[in-house]
């Protein structure tokens, strides 16, 4: 008997994990072949530009706490406003995807407005205005990420492109975490926002080189609707919940990783070097996801990676031992880069226009927003980092509920 989850999933563009082609990739329209590796890289930049601040969250948080004298709670509120804005933007664009045929124009407008908000943040240099400014910036960035995820979902190269998103983010995160702290110490609190402007500008220059990846035509939508087998929403809901919990747990620790390290008497230079190199090594996780996505089904690699992540998070309890702190950062970095493409690919298989892929982006942003906020309140309220590590590990354990859903998609 045919599995309904599998039937509906295969109506979405091939993610790279299923081993089959459900829709042909979009025809070449831009200056690039629409299903090539360069296309995946440029799509990854498009989907990362509105999210790059997440990869340098530790630098931003530490700059606000050490440079501007804010508490963990205040820094958490500012980062929450940025990421909560992204949640609002991603959620809004998820409902509008089918009504944005000229997505390149929309992306260009969002990028220009995001650059403008970063310029305002630097020029005004007013901590009281940071929350509203970063909220608006987050809304623009979230809409851009949701738009990018939707385009990837209908590109025909979703699995590879989602892996490239993590690859781009971790490379950018490496350079940010490696070099920005020293620049912040030399030039001031607002240096990270110059990095955001640079990333957005590069993406804006790449935009004309990306193929069009149009929405399905009315006839294609009609044929798909006639052939579609109704899909129970439970697997999709579980996927979104798992993606939320995964991002929540990881970001709750990552956003405060500098302060966490200092609480275990680790020197700032050691923490910065460890986190930056761990971010670079974590690129291997995204590369591995791209490889296994072409060769293996979803469930088994995802289950193994989630178990390894649980172990990696618990290793942070022993951060006073330097090799263990290094190992914890490397392990969780690699599994973070590995698991997110799998969750996003699962979400993208539920429709052909990319709307469900955009909802996956919404769940991801919600987790990224709530993690630092809850962690900030927890630490300011008197909780220890050891307790926070245990809480984050418990939240991440919920993600194991997505393994049966992945197995169902594999059948």
Language model: regions and residue ranges:
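Helix-to-loop junctions at the C-terminal end of transmembrane segments
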Residues: 89-102, 285-298, 379-380
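Paired small-residue
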Residues: 128-137, 323-331
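Helix-loop-helix hairpin linking two adjacent transmembrane segments in secondary transporters
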Residues: 155, 164-215
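Extracytoplasmic gate region of multi-pass secondary transporters
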Residues: 57-58, 235-276
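Intracellular juxtamembrane helix-capping segments at the cytosolic ends
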Residues: 143-156, 337-351
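C-terminal transmembrane helical hairpin of 12-TM major facilitator-type secondary transporters
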Residues: 297-343
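A late C-terminal transmembrane helix in Major Facilitator Superfamily
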Residues: 350-384, 392
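Cytoplasmic helix-loop-helix junction between adjacent transmembrane helices
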Residues: 135-168
């Amino acid at each position: 008997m045919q599995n309904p989850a599998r039937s509906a999933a295969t109506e979405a563009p091939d993610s790279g994990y299923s081993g089959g082609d459900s829709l042909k990739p979009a025809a070449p329209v831009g200056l690039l072949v629409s299903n090539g590796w360069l296309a995946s890289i440029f799509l990854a930049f498009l989907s990362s530009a509105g999210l790059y601040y997440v990869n340098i969250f530790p630098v931003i948080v530490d700059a606000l706490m050490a440079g501007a004298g804010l508490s963990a709670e205040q820094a958490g509120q500012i980062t929450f406003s940025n990421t909560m804005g992204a949640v609002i933007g991603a959620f809004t664009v998820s409902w509008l995807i089918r009504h944005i045929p000229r997505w390149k124009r929309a992306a260009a407008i969002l990028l220009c407005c995001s650059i403008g908000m970063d310029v305002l943040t630097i020029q005004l240099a007013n901590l009281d205005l940071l929350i509203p400014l970063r909220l608006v910036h987050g809304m623009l960035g979230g809409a851009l990420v949701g738009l990018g995820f939707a385009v990837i979902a209908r590109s025909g190269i979703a699995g590879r492109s989602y892996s490239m998103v993590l690859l781009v983010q971790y490379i950018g995160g490496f350079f940010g975490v490696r070099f920005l702290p020293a620049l912040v110490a030399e030039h001031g609190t607002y240096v990270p926002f110059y990095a955001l402007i640079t990333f957005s500008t590069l993406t804006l220059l790449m935009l004309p080189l990306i193929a069009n990846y149009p929405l399905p035509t009315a006839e294609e939508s009609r044929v798909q609707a006639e052939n579609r087998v109704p899909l129970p929403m439970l697997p999709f809901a579980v996927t979104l919940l798992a993606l939320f919990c995964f991002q929540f747990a990881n970001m709750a620790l990552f956003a405060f990783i500098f302060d966490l390290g200092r609480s275990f008497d680790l020197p700032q230079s050691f923490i910065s070097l460890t986190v930056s190199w761990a971010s670079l090594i974590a690129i291997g996780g995204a590369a591995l996801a791209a490889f296994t996505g072409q060769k293996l089904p979803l469930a088994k690699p995802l289950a193994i990676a989630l178990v390894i992540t649980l172990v990696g998070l618990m290793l942070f309890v022993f951060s006073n031992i330097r090799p263990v702190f290094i190992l914890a950062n490397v392990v969780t970095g690699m599994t973070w880069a590995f698991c997110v493409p799998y969750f996003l690919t699962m979400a993208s298989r539920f429709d052909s226009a990319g709307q469900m892929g955009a909802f996956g982006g919404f769940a991801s942003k919600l987790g990224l927003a709530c993690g630092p906020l809850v962690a900030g309140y927890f630490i300011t309220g008197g909780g220890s980092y050891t307790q926070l590590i245990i809480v984050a590990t418990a939240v991440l354990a919920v993600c194991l509920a997505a393994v049966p859903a992945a197995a169902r998609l594999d059948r």
